[in-house]
Amino acid sequence: MSKTLKKKKHWLSKVQECAVSWAGPPGDLGAEIRGGAERGEFPYLGRLRDEPGGGGGTCCVVSGKAPSPGDVLLEVNGTPVSGLTNRDTLAVIRHFREPIRLKTVKPGKVINKDLRHYLSLQFQKGSIDHKLQQVIRDNLYLITIPCTTRAPRDGEVPGVDYNFISVEQFKALEESGALLESGTYDGNFYGTPKPPAEPSPFQPDPVDQVLFDNEFDTESQRKRTTSVSKMERMDSSLPEEEEDEDKEAVNGSGSMETREMHSESSDCWMKTVPSYNQTNRSMDFRNYMMRDENLEPLPKNWEMAYTDTGTIYFIDHNTKTTTWLDPRLCKKAKAPEDCEDGELPYGWEKIEDPQYGTYYVDHLNQKTQFENPVEEAKRKKQIGQAETHSAKTDVERAHFTRDPSQLKGVLVRASLKKSTMGFGFTIIGGDRPDEFLQVKNVLKDGPAAQDGKMAPGDVIVDINGNCVLGHTHADVVQMFQLVPVNQYVNLTLCRGYALPDDSEDPVVDIVAATPVINGQSLAKGEACMSTQDFKLGAMVLDQNGKSGKLLSSDRLNGPSDSNEQRASLASSGSSQPELVTIPLVKGPKGFGFAIADSPTGQKVKMILDSQWCQGLQKGDIIKEIYHQNVQNLTHLQVVEVLKQFPVGADVPLLILRGGPCSPTKTAKMKTDTKETSGSLETINEPTPQPMPFPPSIIRSGSPKLDPSEVYLKSKTLYEDKPPNTKDLDVFLRKQESGFGFRVLGGDGPDQSIYIGAIIPLGAAEKDGRLRAADELMCIDGIPVKGKSHKQVLDLMTTAARNGHVLLTVRRKIFYGEKQPEDESPQAFSQSGSPRLNRTELPTRSAPQESYDVILQRKENEGFGFVILTSKSKPPPGVIPHKIGRVIDGSPADRCGRLKVGDHISAVNGQSIVDLSHDNIVQLIKDAGVTVTLTVVAEEEHHGPPSGTNSARQSPALQHRPMGQAQATHIPGDRTALEGEVGKDVCSSYRHSWSDHKHLAQPDTAVISVVGSRHSQSLGCYPVELERGPRGFGFSLRGGKEYNMGLFILRLAEDGPAIKDGRIHVGDQIVEINGEPTQGITHTRAIELIQAGGNKVLLLLRPGTGLIPDHGDWDIYSPSSSNVIYDEQPPPLPSSHSAATFEESHVPVTEDSLIRVQTCEKAEELKDTVQEKKSTLNGSQPEMKYQSIQKNVSKKDPSRSHGHGDKNLLKGENGVTRRGRSASPKKSVNRHSEEHLEKIPRPLRSDPKGKSRDRSLSPRKGENKGQVTIKAGSGQDPCRKDRGRSSSPRKQQKIGGNSLSNTEGKLSEAGSRRAAGLSSDSPEQLPEGKEKSGVSRKDLKLSQLGKNRTRSPEKRSSKVDEASLPSKKTSDTASRVVSEKEKGRKPGTGERSRDKTGESVQTSAKPLTQEAGEKMALSKASEVTDRGKERAGGAPESSSPVKKAPITPGPWRVPRANKVTGTAGMADKQL
């Protein structure tokens, strides 16, 4: 295998780059450039002068490997020079400043010095070589004019577009060797002459056009290039093999088999491209090459890529799949009968399988067959298709006989030896008593093929002397199976009967067959079979899914248990019912009857319109539909078979009437009838629903590469139906507004799909059966489990085109939910496709006491409760959603019926048991001002099942949210509230109703939070920026390492980004310089931006001004979530945008909640006056003096740092409230006792102590519990951990004495090592205190204090009072040192990277110390007034410069947090 791969290296793998500079006289390159297009050669390197001498310059290799003399020169500083003259190549080299980058390749058999040779080779369109040929031609046409023998067309100028010459002149040029290319196109000769060594003085300088090609019109070049590209070359040839390389110049595979296939074609030179062949697969690319030269662009989110061998393939970023098929060619695909011999239709693939031989895969319809589709189509065309289905059936029936003497044709006798793989042929027929059994396929290298006497279409007359005319399919199968391996069987065959046409079966040309395992069909793309094998028997798998036992109905393979092979129902020994054939005609609204499951098959449950189904009676069991046995098909499959018939079609039904139906014999009867026909074909890949009994394990005999793997996949896909669930079939007709429901989920292969909101007055609501939170199992019979959100939307789009859809949903039945006996307000639709009334409804135990609570809120308030959701899978019988907090004074509190610990099982009557946290948020948001909660009291909750399927909100099919969710992770000890085993950490989403109107695009906020990968196609726009003196003027957040996308974090003032006007904070970056950003790291994003040089091309999706926090997706994120539906006041008019997502890591007790709510309103009037509009454009001078926002959001007590205790809000210190700015605002200096807020701490589980990002984004920087720094003190001491900026800025000097850099580093290192502990809150020092500095003794105490708080679990609940001053001093030292450490400013344009995935490419101008002091003094009086109003008896400070001693307050150490991976509890200074 490795040798094969090694042989397929493309010449591209030999390309090397180096940077060189010259030392010598100006203009002397120190290297010799030879060749040139005027000589018919590539530019190539001559001698490199590496030693001075002879007065010439020398060539010095700066980086990379030095090229060798003779190497072909491809590019100079990224500019292609192939096709240029020697003069122009030298001019390009001299144009660039040293050092210059050279891209060279060693000459080989594909690329060498001969330019004419390379242009004569034939390459696959779109390949690297084909593109290089186009580049060569473009360069040639800058200085030469192609010639042609055709007459000028309108608008063409001789000597400009073409040189129009006679045929004699053309041949003379060709014989003289003056043409680099020559050929014919549309009956005319075309040629490309060698260019002159010197350009014409009347032409533009070709070098300028090469270097600045964007400024020149290339339309005329393209016209000529197209003509030359399509012409049939006179000296056309395939490229010779490189040493140890196949002909990768064509497509990188060079299979001998495929090379021969194209050698005969001469109609178009492009046809001779061989097909792709790898690991016994071949994909025909000639159809690909036949397309027009100028194809339309690829569909959205598609990308063309190349393999290592240069072969192109296509990437669908919507579905995360790759394909060799060009999606643009599906509209131009030829019909199979129009394809040439050896050519496959578009979408077909040939498989050479060692086990099954050669067969063909139709990727478009997802089916397989043994017969070549082209040969099949041509055969059908020859015999004609004009006869109707019924006429053909009548003719075939007329020919049937049980008397061998009456057979027409030639009798052939064969003796076959059974091998371990069977007899090597497949059979069809025997599904009716009057149908022949015929050979369908003779498998390659099988016993039948080796014998050479059997042929497709042969009728099996007798087996070992036993006449089998009139025998059923299963009878014959069993006879073959009874033959031991290595034993012979004597067959008598009759040759002279054609195989029945596939179109006789109504489903042939529409769908693929789907193998069935355990009575259930496999997923789309996992198993396929040919529609030609419609009547084949089935492969039997053992219980382990092994495929060693193949029924003789398909492969006539080894023996299997006889009890698995049954005869038809008529011969199984059961009572013989009456078989009746009833002709039906499909009416405009269907067949006029409804069907339902029964133990013996699909039963007619109701006659809806007798005029279309005369003779049909209620209770009839459907055995065959249009001669297709449907006994083994499930309800959905039978429904789909009926649906596919057009209106007015005559459809005969074979029904079973009068037979007993014994439920006790259900399993046996199903098994008995399973093998009467191997017909497992379904419509549009329908998927049966789980049956209430395990049928025999059968599957199609269609070849599959790994049956065991397919079985395991299908077993996972169709595992037994969970308990306490029921499945419903809902048939909906499309209205003008659609089907009337939303779709949730599909975020990954293990994510389920759910029904979202039901649209009022829509089709789903009118039908009445569909509910939000129902799990979607199938769409029109196609299973959706494991499919992506985009694929589900595609299925719904297809259904919308059809005008109707059949949905199979699974509904969780949890205790306390009222379930009607029959979910069918509309008993049956009139489409002939009624839904199934299933009998296997789960039995219900004694229900728990549940009750509905209706909450109504005002427009300016929330509902006031917190939902906790366990993200780890709860134990059986546990509802994962519960009330975690009820906010005092809120609607939830006023109601009086919600208590902490109560479980929520439904919202507005819709089960939320299996919904994710985000989807519950959306449901409640959609509820408006009134919501109904179904509550199970905590003490009574013991039984409802739970689910942890995380469903993602559909970005395209989502209600417009009424407000924005705001995420705040609040680790804390929740065991007391939750009463649930497990480690639950809370992530709260505050539902802001009033903030909604301040957001420009509320919908996209939800999309960005959810991280929908399918939203990339929504409203993206490109922006190209040129680098300014300090970069591009924006900073990034996110990356793969932070489990989030890339977002615009900040825009620099006067930077290129903000000047452009189209980029805004919060916009998501979809592509950087053409490369998608999905899944790339932050570092890679920076590299992509740098790689663009002075320009960067961004593809952006508009945001709302909020930046998702990587903490929301952090791998250390808590394992449970809570939602706060609470009031949030509107932001200040000066704020950039409403903050929608915030993050904190502090628990809050009920006591603190009350205090916050009671004192926030009084505080708001004072604080809002002092708040200053924050900037999101990266204006560093303003940011330097911005204080960190208050810790606790208004009416959001969950954001205050520190464990809840009675003294939490002593004085005014606890009444920190969240500002309404999108980024931190300036704050006035406060009393020293006031600065007791906590430094944000990294998660405890993070070994490196990475803290969660505290950015300046609208959703960040608020309520983080960060240190409040007075205006003149410079930057936040914890800025690095908070990730406020990636670009360090120069700080103001803090006093006359400062700590050394060593001390600063030590202090910062200590704070970083405290990965999971709460750094004790550093107080804001008065200016005098700051000037005094910090002694080394204090520094040591600082480290001691940090070590003592490193492990919250080990901390004592009591603290030694003597250690408090030391700890406080250590925090002061930490803050001052951090400020000094951050005082160093990098060079212009330097980019710094913090731990939170942010980088800044611009730095801003620092403010002077005097300006900072002036600003601080301007706030002095306001600080004084505010300090007087503070509660708690704190000493006053009338001036920010006044020295005030630091009085250590009582310290409260939180109890150990039991939650794994949670940040330690923050301490609070009072």
Swiss-Prot record:
GO terms for molecular function: ATP binding; frizzled binding; protein phosphatase binding. Keywords: ATP-binding, Cell junction, Cell membrane, Membrane, Nucleotide-binding, Nucleus, Phosphoprotein, Repeat, Tight junction. GO terms for cellular component: bicellular tight junction; cell-cell junction; cytoplasm; nucleus; plasma membrane. Residues 729-811 are annotated as: Interaction with ADGRB1. Residues 559-575, 676-686, 826-847, 946-956, 1175-1191, 1285-1304 have a biased composition (Polar residues). Residues 193-204 have a biased composition (Pro residues). Residues 184-266, 550-575, 665-700, 818-847, 939-976, 1124-1146, 1167-1470 are annotated as: Disordered. It comes from the Eukaryota. Residues 296-329, 342-375 form the WW domain. Residues 413-495 are annotated as: Interaction with PTEN. Belongs to the MAGUK family. This is Membrane-associated guanylate kinase, WW and PDZ domain-containing protein 3. It comes from Rattus norvegicus (Rat). The gene is Magi3.
